[in-house]
Amino acid sequence: MNHPRSIAMLAALWLVVSVTSTPVRRSPDLEARRRSAIDRSMIRFGRSTLPVVPPAQPSFLQRYSAPQPAALTADDLMTFLRAYEEDYSSPVSKKSASFVRFGRDPSFIRFGRSVDEENSGYQAETNTYPQRRHRARNHFIRLGRDNELSESNDEDRYEVESERTKRSVVDPCNDCA
């Protein structure tokens, strides 16, 4: 009587262990979406992984010569200060100050809205559209509805001046005296 009970317990234990040890399979599209989201965030916040480059083999002289103490010369200091001045001479907006302070690459700041007009927005993939500055227009273009938006803008631009006058300026009745 003890033997069948132990066999049943062993079978149940084997079943639990086999189910818990098998990894959960995600669908391939879900896995691809997760990976691309991780890649996007790594690129956006400046933590993109560098390509793995094997270390160069040191030459014979480097390998067997006496080690030189790493000293900072005056020329090194001047080049460092010039490079630092060039990097930080441009004004940094309040939004990007923390971005740079946290050690991220300043070239990634352009993802948000920019302060200066010449660099604002980004070019479309086809390079046929003008530079876009507004997110709503981006969504219209992605949906293929940019013609509707441009037609409504043309109508607004060429409005009749009489329609633009205030109601309070127009006399309610011309014959009243």
Curated annotation (Swiss-Prot):
Positions carrying Phenylalanine amide are F45, F102, F111
Q: Where is the composition biased (Basic and acidic residues)?
A: 159-169
Q: Does the keyword Zinc apply?
A: no
From which organism does this entry originate? Bombyx mori (Silk moth)
User: Does the record's keyword annotation contain Repeat?
Assistant: yes
A Gene Ontology annotation in the biological process aspect, one of them, is: neuropeptide signaling pathway
Propeptide residue intervals: 22-32, 47-93, 113-131, 145-177
Q: Which residues carry this modification: Leucine amide?
A: L143
Signal peptide (residue range): 1-21
Compartments reported by the entry: Secreted
Report what the protein is called. Answer: FMRFamide-related peptides
Which cellular component terms (GO) are annotated to the entry? extracellular region
Q: Give the superkingdom in one word.
A: Eukaryota
State its role.
Regulates ecdysteroidogenesis by direct innervation of the prothoracic gland by reducing cAMP production via the receptor for myosuppressin. The neurons that innervate the prothoracic gland during the fifth instar are most active during days 0-4, after which they reduce and then peak again on day 6. Expression suppresses the biosynthesis of steroid hormones called ecdysteroids that elicit molting and metamorphosis.
User: Which residue ranges are recorded for the region named Disordered?
Assistant: 145-177
